[in-house]
Amino acid sequence: MSSSREAVAACRRQMEAQLDKLRALNASEAPAEAVAPELAALQSLSTQLSELSVSKKNKGKITLKTPKGTRDWEPLAMALRKHVFATIERVFTTHGAVTIDTPVFELKEILAGKYGEDSKLIYDLQDQGGELCSLRYDLTVPFARFVAMNPTEYGNIKRYHIAKVYRRDQPAMTKGRFREFYQCDFDIAGSYDAMVPDAECLCVLVETLDALDIGSFTVKVNHRKILDAIFAVCGVPEDKIRTISSAVDKLDKSPWADVKHEMVEEKGLEESVADQIGTYVQQRGGRELIAKLQGDAVLTQNERAVEGLAEMELLYQYLDVYGVTDRLSFDLSLARGLDYYTGVIYEAVTALSAPPSMTAASSDNNDGSEKTKKKNVAAENGELDESTVGVGSIAAGGRYDHLVGMFSGSKRPDAVPCVGVSIGVERVFSILMQRIQEMQARGERSSVRQKEVEVFVLSMGCLLYTSDAADER
Protein backbone atom coordinates (compact mmCIF):
# COMPACT_ATOMS: atom_id res chain seq x y z
CA MET A 1 0.00 0.00 0.00
CA SER A 2 2.84 2.36 0.92
CA SER A 3 4.73 1.69 -2.33
CA SER A 4 1.56 2.30 -4.35
CA ARG A 5 1.00 5.60 -2.56
CA GLU A 6 4.61 6.62 -3.22
CA ALA A 7 4.20 5.81 -6.91
CA VAL A 8 1.08 8.01 -7.11
CA ALA A 9 2.86 10.89 -5.34
CA ALA A 10 5.86 10.58 -7.66
CA CYS A 11 3.61 10.60 -10.72
CA ARG A 12 1.83 13.72 -9.44
CA ARG A 13 5.18 15.47 -9.01
CA GLN A 14 6.16 14.54 -12.56
CA MET A 15 2.86 15.96 -13.83
CA GLU A 16 3.41 19.26 -11.98
CA ALA A 17 6.91 19.53 -13.45
CA GLN A 18 5.53 18.81 -16.92
CA LEU A 19 2.79 21.43 -16.43
CA ASP A 20 5.40 24.00 -15.42
CA LYS A 21 7.34 23.17 -18.59
CA LEU A 22 4.21 23.67 -20.72
CA ARG A 23 3.39 26.97 -19.00
CA ALA A 24 6.92 28.20 -19.70
CA LEU A 25 6.55 27.24 -23.37
CA ASN A 26 3.20 29.04 -23.60
CA ALA A 27 4.63 32.12 -21.89
CA SER A 28 7.51 32.23 -24.39
CA GLU A 29 5.05 31.70 -27.28
CA ALA A 30 6.95 28.61 -28.41
CA PRO A 31 5.99 27.09 -31.80
CA ALA A 32 3.38 24.33 -31.93
CA GLU A 33 5.96 21.69 -32.93
CA ALA A 34 7.84 22.36 -29.68
CA VAL A 35 4.68 22.21 -27.54
CA ALA A 36 3.17 19.05 -29.07
CA PRO A 37 5.64 16.47 -27.65
CA GLU A 38 5.48 18.03 -24.19
CA LEU A 39 1.68 17.92 -24.31
CA ALA A 40 1.80 14.26 -25.35
CA ALA A 41 4.11 13.54 -22.41
CA LEU A 42 1.63 15.20 -20.04
CA GLN A 43 -1.25 13.10 -21.42
CA SER A 44 0.86 9.96 -20.96
CA LEU A 45 1.54 10.88 -17.33
CA SER A 46 -2.17 11.54 -16.81
CA THR A 47 -3.02 8.06 -18.11
CA GLN A 48 -0.33 6.55 -15.90
CA LEU A 49 -1.72 8.35 -12.85
CA SER A 50 -5.23 7.07 -13.59
CA GLU A 51 -3.95 3.49 -13.76
CA LEU A 52 -1.98 3.85 -10.52
CA SER A 53 -4.97 5.36 -8.72
CA VAL A 54 -7.21 2.37 -9.49
CA SER A 55 -6.36 -0.77 -7.54
CA LYS A 56 -6.70 -4.21 -9.16
CA LYS A 57 -9.62 -4.99 -6.88
CA ASN A 58 -11.58 -1.91 -7.96
CA LYS A 59 -10.56 -1.88 -11.63
CA GLY A 60 -13.64 -1.47 -13.80
CA LYS A 61 -15.69 0.06 -10.99
CA ILE A 62 -16.77 3.70 -11.01
CA THR A 63 -15.49 5.81 -8.12
CA LEU A 64 -18.40 7.84 -6.78
CA LYS A 65 -16.93 11.22 -5.89
CA THR A 66 -17.00 14.80 -7.04
CA PRO A 67 -13.90 16.23 -8.75
CA LYS A 68 -11.26 17.75 -6.50
CA GLY A 69 -12.23 21.25 -5.40
CA THR A 70 -15.97 20.75 -5.96
CA ARG A 71 -18.82 19.48 -3.81
CA ASP A 72 -22.55 18.77 -3.67
CA TRP A 73 -24.85 20.97 -1.61
CA GLU A 74 -27.46 19.37 0.66
CA PRO A 75 -30.87 21.03 1.40
CA LEU A 76 -29.75 22.91 4.56
CA ALA A 77 -26.69 24.27 2.78
CA MET A 78 -28.79 25.31 -0.21
CA ALA A 79 -31.27 27.08 2.05
CA LEU A 80 -28.42 29.07 3.60
CA ARG A 81 -26.91 29.82 0.19
CA LYS A 82 -30.27 31.04 -1.09
CA HIS A 83 -30.48 33.41 1.89
CA VAL A 84 -26.91 34.66 1.31
CA PHE A 85 -27.46 35.31 -2.40
CA ALA A 86 -30.78 37.08 -1.78
CA THR A 87 -29.22 39.31 0.89
CA ILE A 88 -26.29 40.28 -1.34
CA GLU A 89 -28.55 40.95 -4.33
CA ARG A 90 -30.81 43.15 -2.19
CA VAL A 91 -27.89 45.39 -1.19
CA PHE A 92 -26.62 45.60 -4.79
CA THR A 93 -30.00 46.59 -6.22
CA THR A 94 -30.54 49.13 -3.43
CA HIS A 95 -27.53 50.96 -4.85
CA GLY A 96 -29.11 51.01 -8.31
CA ALA A 97 -27.17 48.20 -9.97
CA VAL A 98 -28.54 46.12 -12.85
CA THR A 99 -27.41 42.58 -13.61
CA ILE A 100 -25.82 40.97 -16.68
CA ASP A 101 -24.57 37.49 -17.57
CA THR A 102 -21.57 36.39 -19.65
CA PRO A 103 -20.38 33.01 -21.01
CA VAL A 104 -18.78 30.66 -18.51
CA PHE A 105 -15.81 30.35 -20.89
CA GLU A 106 -13.99 33.08 -22.79
CA LEU A 107 -11.46 33.18 -25.60
CA LYS A 108 -8.07 32.38 -24.08
CA GLU A 109 -6.57 35.63 -25.41
CA ILE A 110 -9.20 37.63 -23.46
CA LEU A 111 -7.98 36.23 -20.13
CA ALA A 112 -4.26 36.02 -20.96
CA GLY A 113 -1.96 38.49 -19.23
CA LYS A 114 -4.58 39.94 -16.87
CA TYR A 115 -3.84 38.07 -13.63
CA GLY A 116 -0.06 38.21 -13.15
CA GLU A 117 1.33 35.12 -11.41
CA ASP A 118 -2.22 33.81 -10.89
CA SER A 119 -2.56 33.17 -14.64
CA LYS A 120 -1.26 29.65 -13.99
CA LEU A 121 -4.55 28.92 -12.19
CA ILE A 122 -6.68 29.40 -15.33
CA TYR A 123 -8.44 26.29 -16.68
CA ASP A 124 -7.71 25.93 -20.41
CA LEU A 125 -10.14 23.97 -22.60
CA GLN A 126 -9.27 21.73 -25.53
CA ASP A 127 -9.34 23.28 -28.98
CA GLN A 128 -12.90 23.27 -30.33
CA GLY A 129 -13.39 24.38 -33.91
CA GLY A 130 -10.27 26.53 -34.07
CA GLU A 131 -10.97 28.67 -30.97
CA LEU A 132 -8.76 28.39 -27.89
CA CYS A 133 -10.95 28.95 -24.83
CA SER A 134 -10.55 29.05 -21.05
CA LEU A 135 -12.99 28.92 -18.16
CA ARG A 136 -13.47 32.36 -16.64
CA TYR A 137 -11.16 33.06 -13.70
CA ASP A 138 -13.26 35.92 -12.33
CA LEU A 139 -16.20 38.12 -13.36
CA THR A 140 -14.20 41.35 -13.75
CA VAL A 141 -12.36 40.64 -17.00
CA PRO A 142 -15.54 39.34 -18.76
CA PHE A 143 -17.33 42.53 -17.59
CA ALA A 144 -14.57 44.70 -19.05
CA ARG A 145 -14.81 42.77 -22.33
CA PHE A 146 -18.61 43.28 -22.30
CA VAL A 147 -18.24 47.05 -21.80
CA ALA A 148 -15.56 47.26 -24.51
CA MET A 149 -17.96 45.55 -26.94
CA ASN A 150 -20.85 47.88 -25.99
CA PRO A 151 -19.21 51.23 -25.12
CA THR A 152 -22.04 53.46 -26.30
CA GLU A 153 -24.83 51.70 -24.44
CA TYR A 154 -22.95 50.48 -21.37
CA GLY A 155 -19.96 52.82 -21.06
CA ASN A 156 -21.59 54.20 -17.93
CA ILE A 157 -23.23 51.52 -15.79
CA LYS A 158 -23.64 50.14 -12.29
CA ARG A 159 -23.71 46.39 -12.72
CA TYR A 160 -23.80 43.33 -10.50
CA HIS A 161 -23.14 39.74 -11.48
CA ILE A 162 -23.56 36.57 -9.42
CA ALA A 163 -22.09 33.52 -11.16
CA LYS A 164 -19.57 30.68 -11.00
CA VAL A 165 -15.85 31.02 -11.74
CA TYR A 166 -13.08 28.41 -11.95
CA ARG A 167 -9.50 28.26 -10.66
CA ARG A 168 -6.89 25.50 -10.54
CA ASP A 169 -6.16 26.36 -6.92
CA GLN A 170 -5.28 24.08 -4.00
CA PRO A 171 -8.74 23.61 -2.46
CA ALA A 172 -9.52 23.82 1.26
CA MET A 173 -13.22 22.95 1.33
CA THR A 174 -14.10 23.80 4.92
CA LYS A 175 -12.39 27.17 4.50
CA GLY A 176 -14.50 28.15 1.50
CA ARG A 177 -11.71 27.56 -1.02
CA PHE A 178 -12.89 25.66 -4.12
CA ARG A 179 -11.98 25.19 -7.75
CA GLU A 180 -15.56 25.89 -8.79
CA PHE A 181 -17.20 28.66 -6.80
CA TYR A 182 -19.52 31.66 -6.94
CA GLN A 183 -18.48 35.29 -7.00
CA CYS A 184 -20.83 38.19 -6.31
CA ASP A 185 -19.53 41.34 -8.02
CA PHE A 186 -20.65 44.97 -7.90
CA ASP A 187 -18.92 47.36 -10.34
CA ILE A 188 -19.27 50.96 -11.48
CA ALA A 189 -18.03 51.81 -14.99
CA GLY A 190 -17.77 55.35 -16.34
CA SER A 191 -16.41 58.78 -15.46
CA TYR A 192 -17.43 60.33 -12.13
CA ASP A 193 -15.95 62.81 -9.68
CA ALA A 194 -12.74 61.51 -8.12
CA MET A 195 -13.19 58.80 -5.46
CA VAL A 196 -17.01 58.99 -5.46
CA PRO A 197 -17.57 55.51 -6.98
CA ASP A 198 -14.65 54.10 -4.96
CA ALA A 199 -16.32 55.27 -1.74
CA GLU A 200 -19.66 53.79 -2.81
CA CYS A 201 -18.08 50.40 -3.54
CA LEU A 202 -16.53 50.37 -0.06
CA CYS A 203 -19.90 51.33 1.39
CA VAL A 204 -21.53 48.45 -0.54
CA LEU A 205 -18.90 46.09 0.86
CA VAL A 206 -19.58 47.15 4.46
CA GLU A 207 -23.38 47.15 4.04
CA THR A 208 -23.31 43.67 2.50
CA LEU A 209 -21.23 42.08 5.26
CA ASP A 210 -23.36 43.81 7.90
CA ALA A 211 -26.55 42.53 6.23
CA LEU A 212 -25.10 39.00 6.25
CA ASP A 213 -24.37 39.35 9.98
CA ILE A 214 -20.85 38.08 9.43
CA GLY A 215 -19.63 39.48 12.73
CA SER A 216 -16.58 41.66 13.30
CA PHE A 217 -14.49 42.45 10.22
CA THR A 218 -11.88 44.95 9.03
CA VAL A 219 -11.53 46.45 5.55
CA LYS A 220 -7.87 46.84 4.61
CA VAL A 221 -7.26 49.66 2.11
CA ASN A 222 -4.23 50.65 0.05
CA HIS A 223 -3.43 52.41 -3.24
CA ARG A 224 -1.45 50.93 -6.13
CA LYS A 225 0.08 54.33 -6.92
CA ILE A 226 1.46 54.56 -3.38
CA LEU A 227 2.71 50.97 -3.45
CA ASP A 228 4.40 51.40 -6.83
CA ALA A 229 5.97 54.65 -5.60
CA ILE A 230 7.36 52.83 -2.55
CA PHE A 231 8.96 50.22 -4.80
CA ALA A 232 10.37 52.95 -7.05
CA VAL A 233 11.97 55.03 -4.27
CA CYS A 234 13.38 51.86 -2.68
CA GLY A 235 15.12 50.95 -5.94
CA VAL A 236 13.06 48.03 -7.28
CA PRO A 237 13.69 47.58 -11.03
CA GLU A 238 10.64 48.31 -13.18
CA ASP A 239 10.49 44.74 -14.51
CA LYS A 240 10.36 43.31 -10.97
CA ILE A 241 7.64 45.54 -9.50
CA ARG A 242 4.74 43.17 -10.15
CA THR A 243 6.53 40.07 -8.83
CA ILE A 244 7.74 41.93 -5.72
CA SER A 245 4.19 43.21 -5.25
CA SER A 246 2.92 39.61 -5.27
CA ALA A 247 5.47 38.70 -2.60
CA VAL A 248 4.44 41.64 -0.37
CA ASP A 249 0.80 40.56 -0.69
CA LYS A 250 1.66 37.41 1.29
CA LEU A 251 2.35 39.38 4.49
CA ASP A 252 -1.16 38.56 5.74
CA LYS A 253 -0.21 34.84 5.70
CA SER A 254 3.56 34.84 6.28
CA PRO A 255 5.98 36.72 8.57
CA TRP A 256 8.20 39.44 7.10
CA ALA A 257 11.29 37.19 7.30
CA ASP A 258 9.68 34.68 4.89
CA VAL A 259 8.53 37.40 2.50
CA LYS A 260 11.97 39.00 2.51
CA HIS A 261 13.57 35.61 1.82
CA GLU A 262 11.30 35.16 -1.21
CA MET A 263 12.14 38.61 -2.56
CA VAL A 264 15.89 38.15 -2.15
CA GLU A 265 16.45 34.44 -2.83
CA GLU A 266 13.67 33.72 -5.33
CA LYS A 267 13.00 37.08 -7.00
CA GLY A 268 16.64 38.22 -7.08
CA LEU A 269 16.16 41.50 -5.22
CA GLU A 270 19.07 43.09 -3.36
CA GLU A 271 18.81 42.64 0.41
CA SER A 272 19.24 46.37 1.10
CA VAL A 273 16.32 47.14 -1.21
CA ALA A 274 14.16 44.52 0.52
CA ASP A 275 14.99 46.07 3.91
CA GLN A 276 13.88 49.50 2.69
CA ILE A 277 10.62 48.02 1.41
CA GLY A 278 10.09 46.42 4.82
CA THR A 279 10.20 49.78 6.60
CA TYR A 280 7.17 50.86 4.56
CA VAL A 281 5.01 47.78 4.00
CA GLN A 282 4.88 46.81 7.68
CA GLN A 283 3.04 50.05 8.49
CA ARG A 284 -0.72 50.23 8.98
CA GLY A 285 -3.16 52.63 10.62
CA GLY A 286 -5.85 55.14 9.76
CA ARG A 287 -5.99 58.67 8.44
CA GLU A 288 -2.93 59.55 10.54
CA LEU A 289 -0.79 57.26 8.34
CA ILE A 290 -1.69 59.38 5.30
CA ALA A 291 -0.36 62.47 7.08
CA LYS A 292 2.79 60.59 8.11
CA LEU A 293 3.52 59.51 4.54
CA GLN A 294 2.81 63.01 3.23
CA GLY A 295 5.60 64.15 5.53
CA ASP A 296 8.05 61.59 4.12
CA ALA A 297 10.52 63.71 2.11
CA VAL A 298 11.83 60.73 0.11
CA LEU A 299 8.45 59.23 -0.80
CA THR A 300 6.82 62.53 -1.76
CA GLN A 301 9.52 63.16 -4.36
CA ASN A 302 7.61 60.59 -6.40
CA GLU A 303 4.67 62.15 -8.25
CA ARG A 304 2.58 58.97 -8.11
CA ALA A 305 2.92 58.86 -4.33
CA VAL A 306 1.65 62.45 -4.05
CA GLU A 307 -1.35 61.62 -6.29
CA GLY A 308 -2.16 58.43 -4.39
CA LEU A 309 -1.99 60.07 -0.96
CA ALA A 310 -4.24 62.93 -2.12
CA GLU A 311 -6.79 60.41 -3.42
CA MET A 312 -6.65 58.44 -0.16
CA GLU A 313 -7.29 61.65 1.80
CA LEU A 314 -10.32 62.43 -0.38
CA LEU A 315 -11.56 58.84 -0.03
CA TYR A 316 -11.52 59.09 3.76
CA GLN A 317 -13.55 62.32 3.56
CA TYR A 318 -16.28 60.60 1.53
CA LEU A 319 -16.25 57.55 3.80
CA ASP A 320 -16.74 59.84 6.80
CA VAL A 321 -20.06 60.83 5.19
CA TYR A 322 -20.99 57.16 4.73
CA GLY A 323 -19.99 56.50 8.34
CA VAL A 324 -17.73 53.51 7.64
CA THR A 325 -14.22 54.85 8.37
CA ASP A 326 -14.20 53.00 11.70
CA ARG A 327 -14.12 49.72 9.69
CA LEU A 328 -11.03 50.72 7.67
CA SER A 329 -7.32 50.05 8.13
CA PHE A 330 -4.85 51.78 5.80
CA ASP A 331 -2.47 48.83 5.30
CA LEU A 332 0.64 49.29 3.14
CA SER A 333 1.17 45.51 2.86
CA LEU A 334 -2.03 45.08 0.84
CA ALA A 335 -1.02 44.58 -2.79
CA ARG A 336 -3.73 42.48 -4.53
CA GLY A 337 -1.85 40.23 -6.96
CA LEU A 338 -3.99 40.92 -10.04
CA ASP A 339 -2.21 43.04 -12.66
CA TYR A 340 -5.21 45.10 -13.76
CA TYR A 341 -5.58 47.23 -10.59
CA THR A 342 -4.52 50.88 -11.01
CA GLY A 343 -5.78 52.79 -7.95
CA VAL A 344 -7.44 52.12 -4.61
CA ILE A 345 -7.47 48.45 -3.58
CA TYR A 346 -9.20 46.83 -0.60
CA GLU A 347 -10.14 43.56 1.04
CA ALA A 348 -12.22 42.58 4.07
CA VAL A 349 -10.88 40.14 6.65
CA THR A 350 -12.16 38.55 9.85
CA ALA A 351 -10.48 36.80 12.75
CA LEU A 352 -10.88 33.55 10.76
CA SER A 353 -9.06 34.96 7.72
CA ALA A 354 -5.54 34.35 9.01
CA PRO A 355 -4.05 30.83 9.11
CA PRO A 356 -3.45 29.15 12.48
CA SER A 357 -0.22 30.09 14.25
CA MET A 358 2.98 28.36 13.21
CA THR A 359 3.41 27.23 16.80
CA ALA A 360 0.14 25.35 16.80
CA ALA A 361 0.96 23.78 13.46
CA SER A 362 4.36 22.71 14.71
CA SER A 363 2.97 21.03 17.82
CA ASP A 364 0.37 19.21 15.72
CA ASN A 365 3.06 17.92 13.36
CA ASN A 366 5.09 16.43 16.20
CA ASP A 367 2.41 14.73 18.25
CA GLY A 368 2.39 11.47 16.22
CA SER A 369 -1.42 11.42 16.27
CA GLU A 370 -3.85 10.06 13.71
CA LYS A 371 -4.50 13.67 12.68
CA THR A 372 -0.81 14.05 11.80
CA LYS A 373 -0.87 10.85 9.73
CA LYS A 374 -3.80 12.20 7.73
CA LYS A 375 -1.86 15.40 7.09
CA ASN A 376 1.08 13.38 5.78
CA VAL A 377 -1.18 11.39 3.44
CA ALA A 378 -2.68 14.64 2.17
CA ALA A 379 0.79 16.00 1.47
CA GLU A 380 1.76 12.86 -0.44
CA ASN A 381 -1.34 13.18 -2.60
CA GLY A 382 -0.56 16.81 -3.42
CA GLU A 383 -3.49 18.08 -1.37
CA LEU A 384 -3.63 21.14 0.86
CA ASP A 385 -3.95 20.49 4.60
CA GLU A 386 -6.97 22.58 5.60
CA SER A 387 -5.84 22.93 9.21
CA THR A 388 -2.90 25.07 8.06
CA VAL A 389 -4.92 27.70 6.17
CA GLY A 390 -7.38 30.40 7.13
CA VAL A 391 -10.58 31.46 5.41
CA GLY A 392 -8.75 34.32 3.69
CA SER A 393 -10.34 37.60 2.64
CA ILE A 394 -14.14 37.53 2.51
CA ALA A 395 -14.45 40.43 0.05
CA ALA A 396 -12.02 42.35 -2.16
CA GLY A 397 -11.82 44.80 -5.01
CA GLY A 398 -10.36 48.01 -6.33
CA ARG A 399 -10.00 50.39 -9.25
CA TYR A 400 -9.04 49.13 -12.73
CA ASP A 401 -9.07 52.08 -15.13
CA HIS A 402 -7.19 50.52 -18.06
CA LEU A 403 -8.83 47.10 -18.42
CA VAL A 404 -11.64 48.15 -20.78
CA GLY A 405 -9.14 50.13 -22.86
CA MET A 406 -6.99 47.00 -23.27
CA PHE A 407 -9.90 45.38 -25.12
CA SER A 408 -11.30 48.37 -27.01
CA GLY A 409 -7.98 49.51 -28.48
CA SER A 410 -8.79 53.09 -27.51
CA LYS A 411 -6.00 55.68 -27.76
CA ARG A 412 -6.98 56.60 -24.20
CA PRO A 413 -6.45 53.48 -22.04
CA ASP A 414 -8.58 55.00 -19.27
CA ALA A 415 -11.47 55.96 -21.58
CA VAL A 416 -13.86 53.86 -19.43
CA PRO A 417 -12.55 53.86 -15.84
CA CYS A 418 -13.99 51.18 -13.54
CA VAL A 419 -14.04 50.25 -9.87
CA GLY A 420 -15.70 47.33 -8.12
CA VAL A 421 -15.94 44.90 -5.25
CA SER A 422 -16.36 41.12 -5.15
CA ILE A 423 -17.95 39.32 -2.19
CA GLY A 424 -16.26 35.98 -1.43
CA VAL A 425 -19.57 34.23 -0.99
CA GLU A 426 -18.12 30.74 -0.45
CA ARG A 427 -15.95 31.97 2.39
CA VAL A 428 -18.85 33.89 3.90
CA PHE A 429 -20.94 30.75 3.59
CA SER A 430 -18.32 28.63 5.38
CA ILE A 431 -18.35 31.05 8.33
CA LEU A 432 -22.16 31.15 8.54
CA MET A 433 -22.45 27.36 8.13
CA GLN A 434 -19.97 26.80 10.94
CA ARG A 435 -22.12 29.06 13.13
CA ILE A 436 -25.25 27.01 12.33
CA GLN A 437 -23.46 23.74 13.11
CA GLU A 438 -22.32 25.12 16.45
CA MET A 439 -25.92 26.14 17.24
CA GLN A 440 -27.16 22.66 16.35
CA ALA A 441 -24.51 21.11 18.60
CA ARG A 442 -25.86 23.21 21.48
CA GLY A 443 -29.42 22.12 20.69
CA GLU A 444 -30.42 25.56 19.40
CA ARG A 445 -32.50 26.20 16.30
CA SER A 446 -31.27 28.25 13.36
CA SER A 447 -33.39 30.84 11.56
CA VAL A 448 -32.46 29.15 8.25
CA ARG A 449 -35.15 26.65 7.25
CA GLN A 450 -34.91 23.96 4.59
CA LYS A 451 -38.61 24.15 3.72
CA GLU A 452 -40.73 27.18 2.97
CA VAL A 453 -43.60 27.72 5.41
CA GLU A 454 -46.69 29.71 4.45
CA VAL A 455 -48.57 31.29 7.33
CA PHE A 456 -52.20 32.35 6.93
CA VAL A 457 -53.74 34.71 9.45
CA LEU A 458 -57.52 34.64 9.55
CA SER A 459 -59.47 37.23 11.51
CA MET A 460 -62.65 35.83 13.10
CA GLY A 461 -65.20 37.94 14.93
CA CYS A 462 -65.90 37.22 18.56
CA LEU A 463 -69.43 35.87 18.88
CA LEU A 464 -71.02 35.81 22.30
CA TYR A 465 -73.19 32.80 22.30
CA THR A 466 -76.47 33.39 24.04
CA SER A 467 -79.55 31.30 23.99
CA ASP A 468 -81.08 33.69 21.43
CA ALA A 469 -78.02 33.47 19.24
CA ALA A 470 -78.17 29.73 19.47
CA ASP A 471 -81.88 29.79 18.44
CA GLU A 472 -81.05 32.02 15.44
CA ARG A 473 -78.54 29.46 14.26
Regions found by a protein language model. Name each.
Residues L49-V141, M149-N150, R179, A199-E200, ...:
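TRNA-binding/sensing appendages of the translation machinery
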Residues K114-D118, V233-G235, V344-Y346:
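Short low-complexity, flexible loop/linker segments enriched in glycine and/or proline
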Residues L121-Q128, V236-A257:
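Acidic, His- and aromatic-enriched active-site or binding-groove loops in soluble protein domains
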Residues S3-E6, A10-R13, E33-A36, A40, ...:
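Alpha-helix boundary/N-cap detector
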Residues L80-H95, E106-E109, T140-I214, K225, ...:
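Positively charged, Gly/Ser-enriched RNA/tRNA-binding surfaces
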Residues D210, G215-S216, A229, G235-D239:
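Retroelement reverse transcriptase polymerase core
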Residues T218-D228:
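Glycine- and charge-enriched loop/helix tracts that form the active or gating conduit
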Residues S2, E6, A10-L80, Q126:
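Auxiliary tRNA-acceptor-end handling modules of aminoacyl-tRNA synthetases
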